[in-house]
UniProtKB/Swiss-Prot annotation:
Main location: secreted
Other known facts: The primary structure of this peptide is identical to that of Ocellatin-F1 from Leptodactylus labyrinthicus (AC C0HKF0). The cross-references to PDB can be found in this entry (AC C0HKF0).
Domain of life the protein comes from: Eukaryota
Tissue specificity as recorded in UniProt: Expressed by the skin glands.
Keywords attached to this entry: Amidation, Amphibian defense peptide, Antibiotic, Antimicrobial, Antiviral protein, Fungicide, Secreted
Organism of origin: Leptodactylus fallax (Mountain chicken frog)
GO biological process assignments: defense response to bacterium; defense response to fungus; regulation of defense response to virus; symbiont-mediated hemolysis of host erythrocyte
InterPro entries on file: Antimicrobial15
Lineage: Eukaryota, Metazoa, Chordata, Craniata, Vertebrata
Residues the record lists as Leucine amide modifications: L25
Name used for this protein in its record: Ocellatin-F1
Family to which the UniProt record says this protein belongs: Belongs to the frog skin active peptide (FSAP) family. Ocellatin subfamily.
Pfam families named among the record's database cross-references: Antimicrobial15
Cellular compartment(s): Secreted
Any one GO CC term of the record: extracellular region
Length: 25
């Protein structure tokens, strides 16, 4: 459903942001 899609997108975005932060450290 739409909620599942939004949850998946949120996880992907969070993963990308986490990767960027880890790369800066």
């Amino acid at each position: 459903g739409v909620v599942d899609i939004l949850k998946g997108a949120a996880k992907d975005i969070a993963g990308h942001l986490a990767s960027k932060v880890m790369n800066k450290l």
